[in-house]
């Protein structure tokens, strides 16, 4: 077991979550580590740690080591999840 934000205890593997654009602004940092068994576990922990992040996660593309994944994707120790919110522009 590992401790996450605010002393929460979670089981699973250690994963780095890297935030981009508006997700980075809401989280207030570039990246952080959480533990979980699948993408849903880790993103749930991130959303619980940062007010407003849940809305951004709902519209973001999530990459696992550069590959788009769904919430049920299992995780391996040491992987990186990237949160890519939609980008505006043209």
List where the protein language model places each region.
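Ubiquitin-like/PB1-type beta-grasp interaction modules and other compact soluble beta-rich domains
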Residues: 1-89
């Amino acid at each position: 077991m590992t401790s996450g934000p605010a002393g929460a205890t979670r089981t699973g593997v250690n994963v780095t979550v890297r935030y981009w654009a508006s997700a980075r602004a809401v989280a207030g940092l570039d990246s952080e580590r959480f533990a979980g068994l699948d993408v849903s576990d880790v993103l749930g922990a991130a959303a619980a740690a940062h007010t407003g992040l849940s809305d951004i996660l709902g519209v973001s593309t999530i990459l696992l080591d550069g590959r788009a994944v769904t919430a049920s994707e299992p995780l391996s120790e040491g992987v990186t999840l990237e949160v890519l919110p939609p980008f505006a522009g043209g």
